[in-house]
Regions:
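Beta-propeller blade termini and top-face loops
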Residues: 1-193
Length: 193
């Protein structure tokens, strides 16, 4: 147990596993720099995110972390200070997010809407026009090709609309659900090992 309550998103610094941030419901965050012996709160001012609020670090600079409400926040010092980035113009809080490995692209979603930023979160463009009107459960960039994005859906129906692939950062989408069953898809990772 890191802090108690409902455990949500967490990150461990990839170069120093004594540095961690754990989060609670609605995005409350606690940080430790000594493996959990001491903790401090590290939220942006007046912060209230979604029930499970996205929290992630930049794969190009692990001291840079992101969290979000309907606005994206970035910390360049592992949570000590926060900068407000662009407004997503989504109705409600951002529920899912992914950061590209090799560029400044960030994808975000709320319910059935998916947007992408090409400038590190300052502005966003809608890319969900040709996708199903269903609840998006996860987003992933291909770690070897930032143009490739996969989006998953959490529907129970036998609608064959669970997993979609774009190879051009969301300009066009291909349904790659194939023969998956009637269960919702909750998470996706692209693995090239």
């Amino acid at each position: 147990e890191f802090y108690g309550a409902d455990g949500m998103e967490g990150i461990i610094h990839p170069l120093n596993d004594d540095w961690m941030i754990g989060s609670l419901q609605f995005g409350g965050k606690r940080r430790t720099k000594d493996g959990g012996y001491n903790q401090d709160g590290v939220n942006p001012d007046d912060f209230s995110g979604d029930w499970v609020t996205p929290l992630m670090y930049d794969p190009n600079d692990q001291m840079t972390i992101y969290t979000m409400t309907n606005i994206l926040y970035r910390s360049d010092d592992f949570g000590s200070t926060w900068n407000t980035l662009g407004d997503s113009f989504l109705e409600g809080n951002i529920q899912n997010a992914a950061i590209a490995e090799n560029s400044s692209a960030i994808a975000i979603s709320n319910y059935n809407r998916l947007k992408i930023s090409y400038d590190g979160g300052m502005t966003f463009t809608e890319i969900s026009q040709s996708l199903p009107n269903q609840f998006i459960t996860d987003i992933a960039f291909d770690p070897n090709n930032d143009d490739t994005i996969i989006v998953t859906y959490g529907t129970y129906g036998n609608n064959n609309q669970k997993v979609y692939l774009s190879e051009n950062q969301g300009e066009t989408w291909q349904n790659i659900t194939y023969n998956l069953g009637n269960m919702p898809i909750r998470s996706v990772v692209i693995d090239h090992t």
